[in-house]
Regions:
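Long, contiguous binding/interaction regions
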Residues: 438-619
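Conserved alpha/beta enzyme-core scaffold
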Residues: 1-433
Length: 619
């Protein structure tokens, strides 16, 4: 028995008085029929109004100058269509953490006279579904006039969504389709960034995704993960795809276990249909979903955030305008804090190395850019298509080096120059401009060894200098002597930077890395070196003594052989102390014949890469 409350949009608008503050739903909850009539009406009572909307992403609320006498928009989100209008002074931004907004409505700190929201049709018991669980309930309680726009195409979503028709003063039957957002196209560069992000996300992690090409790509690259959880302010098409892939079970979440949890719906018509009566996804209020303490109660909470630019110290400039749909400073801060409170949680900022104009996105400073997020003390990871920069626990110099290593190869030489001038890196820092362009990323791989030890392997980078120094100083005197055939006590910067800067053609170095408490640790290194005239390359290996007898050296040897053969190298040589039985065993496992000569306590090894087909014929 609610039909008697159904009125025309004009009758609803006749109840409005000049100066009133009207709350409007966001996204799927935006009452588009009411808003369109409000914009079109010339009635004199519709003047000097305040329209309050959490996120303005629709096309029904014009924000140009000609409507300034009728209304002024207030929003909590600086992105999407409101960005330029905020800068021009036509829209008011209310800076706030999203989890605090319900409290602002409850306390009256933000006054609301009327609430217009879109809802689903009611069930047989008179209960409709809210389509924006964010703060709509609090907005309804704060207003004297509550109007529901009933849309027959709206889904019935699960969670804290039920609202009885008795709680409304009037209803309007919608003549507009709900607000659908088209999906973003995904370029290869975002698939590469997403693949690098996926490599640092463990099975059982809890994630938060927004809207944009990065998140669309992540839905693809995370599809092979297991037991992921979802705790996200926005529910999107990308999350729908990820759940449908089977990667999400939510079994290891700390809150809302077994369910994906969100507060808003932003997506396509297909997603809305999929959510209809779907028990896998529950929607909860904003002050629950975005509360850092609630976010942090999920172990391994991964906040994946897009960035516009990042500087060499770790400061971030967020996107503005239509480049920013779901990652404004307010909700970025809450996700960031939540991940910091989470056991084994981390934040990941992802961005292409260059923007669409071909300008660098990793720069010396972001001080001249708007929408800065300056919380570099808590930064964890920055990811581009060229790799991952681990920042936690790093010095400013180490951060700068790590970020330069994932910048666009053509931008690195200039970044090195600028960083030297700014005294962020060593004044004598070596940099080979060609090394970035020829970095052999195809060598990168990972392998699980005994006792579940996962080791990632990749070609060495200039930013590995400090980790390689730490590896050197962990070795015993005997290990150093076995590797270098002399007693070396120190490994200063000058010497080590020459060691880690290689050209990848004549000299190849592959490091083995483990991740411990969110930071990288090099535990092994293998390399070959030759001159242009040499057909054979000399080899050497070293493995942290804590990780001996796990097969790491043998695996590195296989990687070196594969890489060398692709470079046209015809074989390996090596000098091994006769007492170094473990290293001799590694070489003996070669698929190729090993020729040995013992001279003065040193085995001189020669390993020609005889075609394997010939070896099989001989057998």
């Amino acid at each position: 028995m609610w039909k008697y409350k159904v009125v025309s949009p004009e009758e609803v608008l006749s109840k409005i008085e000049p100066g009133m503050a009207i709350f409007l739903g966001t996204g799927m909850a935006e009452p588009r029929t009411l808003v369109k009539h409000l914009m079109a009406s010339e009635e004199p009572n519709l003047q000097d109004l305040e329209l309050i909307q959490l996120v303005s992403i629709g096309d029904t609320i014009p924000i140009d100058e000609r409507y300034s006498r009728k209304f002024r928009l207030k929003t909590f989100f600086s992105g999407w269509i409101a960005s330029e209008a905020i800068s021009a002074g036509r829209v008011d931004l209310i800076p706030s953490r999203f989890s605090r907004i319900p409290g602002l409505f409850k306390s009256g700190a933000i006054h609301i006279d009327a609430t217009f929201i879109q809802i689903s049709p009611p069930d047989e018991n008179g209960y409709a579904c809210l389509l924006g669980v964010d703060v709509e309930r609090q907005a309804m309680e704060a207003a004297n006039l509550v109007v529901g726009e009933v849309n027959a195409h709206a889904p019935r979503i699960m969670g804290d969504t039920l609202v009885h028709m008795d709680e409304f003063n009037y209803f309007v039957e919608s003549t507009e389709p709900p607000l659908y957002l088209p999906r973003w196209s995904v370029e290869d560069i975002y698939l590469k960034i997403a693949a690098n992000i996926a490599n640092v996300i463990e099975d059982g992690s809890c994630i938060s995704l927004g809207i944009g090409p990065l998140y669309e790509a992540l839905a693809v690259q995370l599809a092979t993960k297991k037991h992921l959880g979802v705790h996200s302010p926005f529910f999107t098409d990308a999350l729908m795809d990820l759940i449908k892939s089977g990667a999400v079970t939510n079994r290891r979440k700390g809150v809302f276990r077994g369910k994906s949890s969100a507060s808003y719906l932003l997506g396509s018509e297909k997603m809305m249909q999929w959510l209809d009566h779907n028990p896998l996804v529950e929607f909860q209020p904003e002050d629950v979903i975005t509360d850092p303490k609630v976010i942090g109660s999920n172990d391994r909470m991964i906040a994946i955030l897009p960035a516009r630019k990042i500087d060499l110290t770790g400061n971030v400039a967020l996107h503005a305008g239509k480049g920013d749909v779901t990652a404004g400073p307010g909700n970025v801060q809450e996700l960031f804090m939540g991940a910091a409170l989470s056991k084994k949680g981390r934040t990941v900022f992802g961005l292409p190395s260059r923007n669409l104009k071909g300008m660098p996105n990793i720069v010396l400073s972001v001080d001249n850019l708007p929408f800065q997020f300056t919380n570099r003390e808590s930064m964890d990871l920055v990811v581009t298509e060229y790799g991952v920069a681990y920042l936690m626990g790093k010095t400013m110099r180490e951060r700068a080096q790590a970020l330069i290593d994932i910048a666009h190869p053509d931008d690195r030489a200039e970044l090195v120059r600028q960083a030297k001038e700014a005294k962020l890196i060593y004044a004598d820092q070596i940099y080979f401009p060609e090394s970035g362009a020829i970095y052999p990323s195809k060598v990168c791989c990972s392998h699980e060894f005994k006792d579940g030890l996962k080791v990632c392997f990749r070609p060495i980078k200039p930013s590995d200098e400090d980790m390689m120094r730490l590896l050197f100083y962990r070795f015993s005197d005997q290990a150093v002597y076995s590797r270098y055939f002399t007693s070396i006590k120190t490994m200063p910067h000058k010497k080590m930077q020459e060691y880690v800067n290689v050209n990848y053609h004549l000299v190849m170095s592959i490091v083995g890395i483990v991740e411990i408490s969110g930071t990288e640790k090099i535990i092994a290194e293998a390399r070959y070196a030759r001159t242009k005239q040499d057909a054979f390359a000399d080899t050497a290996f070293i493995v942290d003594e804590e990780y001996h007898s796990k097969g790491i050296a043998s695996y590195l040897f296989e990687l070196l052989i594969r890489t060398a053969r692709e470079e046209g190298i015809q074989g390996f040589t090596a000098d091994v102390l006769a007492t170094n039985k473990a290293m001799l065993k590694v070489y003996e496992k070669s698929p190729f014949p090993v020729q040995t000569v013992l001279s003065r306590g040193i085995y001189e090894l020669t390993i020609p890469f005889t075609p394997l087909s010939e070896l099989k014929k001989r057998d």
